Structure formats: structure tokens, C-alpha cells
Amino acid sequence: MASNSTKSFLADAGYGEQELDANSALMELDKGLRSGKLGEQCEAVVRFPRLFQKYPFPILINSAFLKLADVFRVGNNFLRLCVLKVTQQSEKHLEKILNVDEFVKRIFSVIHSNDPVARAITLRMLGSLASIIPERKNAHHSIRQSLDSHDNVEVEAAVFAAANFSAQSKDFAVGICNKISEMIQGLATPVDLKLKLIPILQHMHHDAILASSARQLLQQLVTAYPSTRMVIVSLHTFTLLAASSLVDTPKQIQLLLQYLKNDPRKAVKRLAIQDLKLLANKTPHTWSRENIQALCECALQTPYDSLKLGMLSVLATLSGTIAVKHYFSIASGNVGSSPRSSDLVKLAQECCYHNNRGIAAHGVRVLTNITVSCQEKDLLALEQDAVFGLESLLVLCSQDDSPGAQATLKIALNCMVKLAKGRPHLSQSVVETLLTQLHSAQDTARILMCHCLAAIAMQLPVLGDGMLGDLVELYKVIGRSATDKQQELLVSLATVIFVASQKALSAEVKAVIKQQLESVSNGWTVYRIARQASRMGNHDMARELYQTLLTQVASEHFYFWLNSLKEFSHAEQCLTGLQEENYSSALSCIAESLKFYHKGIASLTAASTPLNPLSFQCEFVKLRIDLLQAFSQLICTCNSLKTSPPPAIATTIAMTLGNDLQRCGRISNQMKLSMEEFRSLASRYGDLYQASFDADSATLRNVELQQQSCLLISHAIEALILDPESASFQEYGSTGAAHADSEYERRMMSVYNHVLEEVESLNRKYTPVSYMHTACLCNAIISLLKVPLSFQRYFFQKLQSTSIKLALSPSPRNPAEPIAVQNNQQLALKVEGVVQHGSKPGLFRRIQSVCLNVSSTLQSKSGQDYKIPIDNMTNEMEQRVEPHNDYFSTQFLLNFAILGTHNITVESSVKDANGIVWKTGPRTTIFVKSLEDPYSQQIRLQQQQAQQPLQQQQQRNAYTRF
């Protein structure tokens, strides 16, 4: 079973080399473990983590760890050390060990060795296993005993194990706390050992009493041992304990501020700042105004730039949270106090022009956060200070290529974007500063500044026209070399130009871009610029760039991919010629667009591979094709009112049938079909949305907008023609347009609002169906198609990758072979799964739980038909499980009372942290053959045999009577 399930799990893994199935790979490693050469044994041991990564199901992992435990038991210390490292690297797979008792028994046998190094490695091994054996009393006893050892290596290992078990087990933490306390306070304990014992106290957070006793001990240590190392370790442990227990966080903040203010040692001050930063990130709501005020006073008084930088970093973190609002809300309640006169603002204003770049960056960050957060206050002076500080920082850092200067520049540019969004009236001066500085900046800084300009232009498109001229002039003079930075700058600047140009690019701008690309750019740069053009709706530019790339690729898959993009861009370009009130021209434009779309989907299908099936891209384009066809069909239906008006007897037919719509003739039925078609398309867009778990938010919003377009047209058909009396417009408001994140979304929302206003004005005004109604529908279609389609990032690039692999037990040796089960028994189906991630797990969303749906259908009956309750004929079950360390498992009991072959389907979907369900798959199928149990079969045969003589006697009697 394990072999087959794991083999199917790896069937689609493309590692580029000849892969073995799980059993073969394990046998290869087992052969190495049995080798007489130490080098081969070590090589086999260290290859186990890769085996676990490729075959992450419990049966193989259990077998592998048992083999490693045998090596640990009989091998030398070097092999034991290798096994320990493998165990620590494979921590997420430890819960998949099925025979925990046997595994621990083999490991634990080494604890009785006379070799202290062997005992030390065993203790570290037990500590690494604390997550699966937190309450093993023999392990607890061995750790306590080893803490009293005279061998330093063994004692250090015991300290490591004690820390791990304290984090996992409340009983162990309660039992070991007093012993740790005695050892720390004991005179015989060396100082180095005390420094290693103190961090164990950070895990004493399982209950309030334990945490309180640990805090008291740490308080005594800080007072009794004033040496620098002891104070640093004790304070940091103090902070971690407070952050975990949450109860004593305000006291800990006060203690750290006290040491920051009064202790003269810079090392202690640095530690206090580091811990304050940790608490500011984790619990900003626990900071009082007095805490922030004390930190400001320390920063104002300190003469050391390094300490001032650290304190400002803490204040910058707090300024972006609720703490700063609390600070100013209390300050404004004091007589004669205002935000402009507070120490926090005074400190930030002083630091904005500091000669240290880091201090200046944090100063403007604090000012920006205050300006954006406290919008209800009159902060004109602070706004100007923030803008001037950002300008000076921009001038300073844009001329420097060093990593420190670029990091500071990123902070300043982020503040500019935040300021432009929070205070739109400041955006014009921010943009002018960026454009002025763009000409003289270094290439590295230019790239970052272009990203900033693009972000501001996306939020405030009204600024785009003003910056376009400067950007085009700059584009003419850059790109004199083919360095990576120059290529990156070409892409960044082209992106800003696409964002800034609200409509189609002018011929002059296109000529400038193409001229630069022809001179110094490589193919990858051209592709990235074309990709941005497709994203921003500049399809004519994108088509020309894709055309130039077709002959520059070596793979046919890449050729077909680029060709499909060229055809899609050409198809969208055809729709730019649409004009309102010109419906025949609209039909020809849509037909022309569909022609290129069909060419493109053929190329896109040819570009897909088993490892990269391009499923999202294909489905998105198919939906676009179907949507265009539905639009075309609806325009033809509207035109049919002229070409095929209602017959003269239509009113009589309507009265006879009792359906008032029949007086409109055949158009009423066609409109009903169109409405159902658009609702079906909206449902398919919804399915695509749910299947795109790894997509970025902009792509998902794009899919959502396409779905809303379909719903809008179906609603318009219903409100104008099919059911104008019951049409409601309350749920369709103009909310959301102000919060649009892109120009495409902004334009689509504007079209939606305009169409809804037109439909509402016509609703109940004219009796359906009139030419006014059909014209309104056709104009709505043209308005939607005139907004250039945006191909978002997920169409080109997958930043997050998440997949689920399922293994079913029992599973047949051959996938087509059914599993035999008796009809009077239930099948226990075990479903195991592994969540696999790419290089950036959880970038957009994470899996909170996995929903497993199991259903069975009868494929073919065998034997006689019996009357069986309907409940026994089908199985339909659902369970939710939460993955732990990317692994989950559950079981289902299935009933197969009807004899025959049943098809079992297991389908998985996931729920993210926001409670949204995503249909990610996969879908797995196995077959079960339900057989009659022997006892029932025997009874049935006996009954048949008993009935045979009776039937023969009845036949003789019948012959006799005859």
C-alpha cells in the first residue's frame, strides 16, 4: 500500500533524473547502512533528509527512522552524531513516526552507556524528540540525573534537552524549575553553566504561578549578579518570558526602560533596545504614553548615534501602530499640550536632518506615520517637515550606490507612497521631487524611484499626465550600456510610462521605447516590458514586442507561448475600434477578435507541458472567448427586434398563454437564453477564482471584475426585459470605486455605475421590449469592451506555489484493480496528505484547514437485486482537518451493502486564515468491489437447494393434472 501510494505521489515530480520508488530508494540507503565501511554508512545516513522530502508519507518515514534508531544503537559516536543531525533537520516529519515506543526504546538504550559522549548525544537526541515524547518520565529522569554529571559535555546536552522538554511539557517545566533555580543560585555552579541554564526559564509560561516564580527568580538574578553577561542573559530571558506569558509585558517594558535610562553600560543599553523592539512588534497595545515619553527622553539625551538609532527604530515601529494614536489622544487632553509640542515630534524633527542616514530615515518615518495616523488634527507644520525631510533624504541617498544608502532610500520611498496615499494634497510636491531627482540619481536609486512613482500613479492616476513628459525625455537618454542595472531601469521606467499614460500610447512614446529596446536591450528585458504592457492594457505595444521575440527563443514551447501572447494582444487590439451606437461595427470587431483568440488558444495549448500545464491561463482565455461570443450573440439578439419583429398575433398568443412577454415575439426566449448564458459564465469565473489559491490579489480582483461584468449584463437583461417589476438596484451601489487599486478596476467600476444608472432610468419607463432597451444593452456591452483587458501577474508568473498530495489506504496494487470488501462490513478508508510549497510559502495566503470530501457511486451491479434502504446505496462524507507540519490524516467508514463495483472519489479543498474556501484539488479515485459474505452466501444456497425439490413436486402435480 505504502509503495503504491508513494509511487503515485511522485509520479509527476520532475527532478530531471531517473527516480526510484519509495521502497527502492529506502533499500538503496539500507544497503549503505549495512556496509562495513564507515564512510558509506555516514553517506547513507545523511541522505535520509532528501528521502523524507521526496517521499513524505508516514509508512516510509517510520521504517526509515527505525533503521536510523538501529544505527544509533549499535554505531559509534560519529554515526550517532550524524543520526542526531538528520533528526534535527527532519523535525517536521517526527510526528509521522508510527512506532514511537520502539523508536525511543532503541535510542534510549544508549543512555546507560559508560561513554559520557554517547550519553550526551543521546540526551540531545531525546531533546530533539521532545515534540513527540513530551511526557516520557524516563527521559525526564535521565535529564535531571545528567544535570548533576561531572562531565561538561553531558551537562550541556542535559541543558539542551531540558530547554526543549520545558517548552513542550508543563509537568517537566514545573518539576525542573526548582532544580534550575538551585543550580543557578548554587555557589558550586560555574558562571558559564549558569549562563546556559538561565534561558531555560523563558519556557516557564505554562501557567501563571510558574511564570510568576520564574519572574521572581530572574528578578533576584538581575539584582544579585550585576555583571554584564549575567544581566544581558537574564534581561533577555525576562523579555521572552513576558512576551510568551503576556501578563507581565507592561512591567517588562518599564524594567527595560529603567535599564536603558540608568545603566551606563552600552552593551546593556543595546540589549534593552533590542528587547524593546521585540515587544513593540509583538504587543504595541501594551505601551503606555509614559513608556513612549520615557523612550523619547532617553533618545533626546543620549550622545551616542548607535543608541539613538536603536531607540528611533523602536519609536518608528510604534508610530505605525495604535500606540501613537493612544499617545496623542492622551496628550491632547492635557492643558497646553498639542502634537506639535510633544517630545516625540520634537525628536523626529531633530533627527530628520541628522548626518547619520539611518537616524534621518527613522525620523522621517516617525513623522510620516504621525501625519498619516492623526488626520483629524491640524498638522500642517508636521506635513511640511515630513516632506522636506523626505526630500533631503532622497537627495542624499540617490547619489550613493552603497547597500546602506539603498536600504535608507527604500524607507524614504515607502514613506513617500504612504504620505501620498494618506495625504493626497501632498502628492504633487512628492512627485515633482522624484522627477527632478530622477535625472541625476544613480541607476540603482532610479529603479527604486521608478517603483515609487508607479505606486503613486496607480493610487492617484490624475498625476500620470503630468509626469509622462519627463519620463519620456529620461527614457531617451538612459540605456547606454547593457548592464543588468540598465536593463532593470529600462523595465522600471517603461512600467511607469505605461501607468502614467491613461489612454493608448502615442506614436512618439512607442517610437522612443522601441528605439531604446533595439539598441541595448536583451530578449528578457523586451519580454518583461511587453508583459507590463499587457498588464496595463497597452496591447498594440505588447503585440509588436512579442512579435520581435518570436525568433529569439530556442524552445518550441517558448515559441508557442510567445505566439499565443501575441495573438491575445492582437485580439484585444481589435476591440479598441469599438464605437457606441455602431452595432454592426461592434459585431465585426468582436468576430475579428475571436479569430485571433482562437489562434492564440491553439498556441497556448501547444505551449503547455505536463510539468507546466498552464491551466489558469487556458481557462481564463476560454472564458474570455465564451464571454465575447455571448456578447456577440446578445447584440445579434437585440438586432433581431428589427429583423424579426413580433407577429401580428403575438398579443393574442400572450393572452392565451398568460405570459405577457410572449407579445414581444421570439426575442423574449432569446433574451432568457442570453441571461442564463451570462449567469453560467459568472459561475465559471467564480470556479476559476476558487481554483486560484496561489494567485496574487490583483489577479483575483481581475477575475472578480470579469465575473461582475457577466452578472451586470444578466441583471440588465432581467431588469429591462424579462422582469422589470421585481428588479432591485439597492445591492448594486457605487461603493468600491473609491477604493480601486488599479486604473483598470477604476474604469470598470465607472462603467458599471454608468450602466446601472442607464438601466435604472429605463426600468419601468417603457414597456419591454423597445429599441431603447436593446440599445441600452448594446451600449453596455460596448462600454465594457472598450476598457482594455488587463492580463495580471498570475497569467505570466507564479510567485506562490501550493499543492496537496493525497495517499489512500488501502490502495490496490494496480490502479484499475478494485479492492475487495464484504457487503456486511464497512471499509475503513484512511486518507493521508502532504502540503507542498514552493520557494515562498504563504506569500499571499496560507492553508488553515483541509476539507476532504468522500463520495461513492455504484458502477455496476452483480447478483440479484435486493430491496436495500436508500441510505446504504451511496456514501457522502466530509471532514475538515488542520495540517500540522504540512501533514494531515483522517479516516472514513464507508458502507457497500449493494453487491457490485463502486467508484470512490476523494476530493480536497482548503480553507485559508480568512475562512475562504478554495477548490485546489486534487481528486483521487479508487474502485471497490462489494462481495457477498460467506455466511449469507451459504444461507442463500441452502434456501435454493431446499426450494428445488418443492418446485419439482409442483411441476409433477401440474403434469398429472394435465
From Swiss-Prot:
Entry-linked Pfam families: INTS7_C, INTS7_HB, INTS7_N
Main location group: nucleus
Annotated localization: Nucleus; Chromosome; Cytoplasm
Gene3D superfamilies to which the protein is assigned, alphabetical: Leucine-rich Repeat Variant (1.25.10.10)
InterPro entries attached to this UniProt entry: ARM-like, ARM-type_fold, INTS7, INTS7_C, INTS7_HB, INTS7_N
Location of Phosphoserine modifications: 338, 809
Cellular component annotations (GO), alphabetically ordered: chromosome; cytoplasm; INTAC complex; integrator complex; nuclear body; nucleus
Gene Ontology BP term (one): RNA polymerase II transcription initiation surveillance
UniProt keyword annotations, A-Z: Chromosome, Cytoplasm, DNA damage, Nucleus, Phosphoprotein
Biological role: Component of the integrator complex, a multiprotein complex that terminates RNA polymerase II (Pol II) transcription in the promoter-proximal region of genes.
Quaternary data: Component of the Integrator complex, composed of core subunits INTS1, INTS2, INTS3, INTS4, INTS5, INTS6, INTS7, INTS8, INTS9/RC74, INTS10, INTS11/CPSF3L, INTS12, INTS13, INTS14 and INTS15. The core complex associates with protein phosphatase 2A subunits PPP2CA and PPP2R1A, to form the Integrator-PP2A (INTAC) complex. Interacts with NABP2.
UniProt similarity note: Belongs to the Integrator subunit 7 family.
Name under which the protein is recorded: Integrator complex subunit 7
Gene it is expressed from: INTS7
